[in-house]
């Protein structure tokens, strides 16, 4: 499995984008308007714009990073490749 970029010392938004042919999957760890940590996932096709999404509230930043790790393993098992965002590197 590819190594995920380390989170910055001060917790803040972390986003990952996975691609496979014409499919994409993104996962973003950030605070919402109620100051709760959430993992927002979205997926779909780059061809027709169809897709979906889900928001999961997590207990804290560390729990969110753990969930991102689980998501990354699952995406790689399905053939997706992680694209590193420069903001996370």
Which residues does each PLM region occupy?
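Conserved short hydrophobic interaction patches
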Residues: 67-74, 78
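Boundary/linker segments flanking structured domains
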Residues: 1-4, 8, 78-89
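Short aromatic-glycine-(Arg/Gly/Cys) micro-motifs in beta-strand/loop hairpins
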Residues: 28-55, 69, 81, 85-87
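Short amphipathic alpha-helices within nucleic acid-binding modules
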Residues: 60-68
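A near-ubiquitous, low-amplitude feature marking generic local secondary-structure context
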Residues: 10-12, 22, 47, 51-54, ...
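Short N-terminal "domain-start" leader segments
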Residues: 1-38
């Amino acid at each position: 499995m590819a190594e995920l970029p380390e989170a910055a010392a001060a917790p803040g938004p972390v986003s990952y984008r996975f691609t496979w042919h014409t499919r994409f999957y993104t996962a973003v760890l950030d605070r919402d308007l109620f100051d709760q940590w959430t993992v927002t996932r979205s997926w779909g096709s780059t061809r027709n714009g169809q897709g979906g999404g889900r928001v999961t509230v997590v207990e804290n930043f560390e729990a969110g990073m753990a969930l991102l790790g689980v998501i990354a393993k699952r995406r790689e098992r399905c053939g997706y490749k992680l694209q590193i965002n420069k903001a996370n590197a």
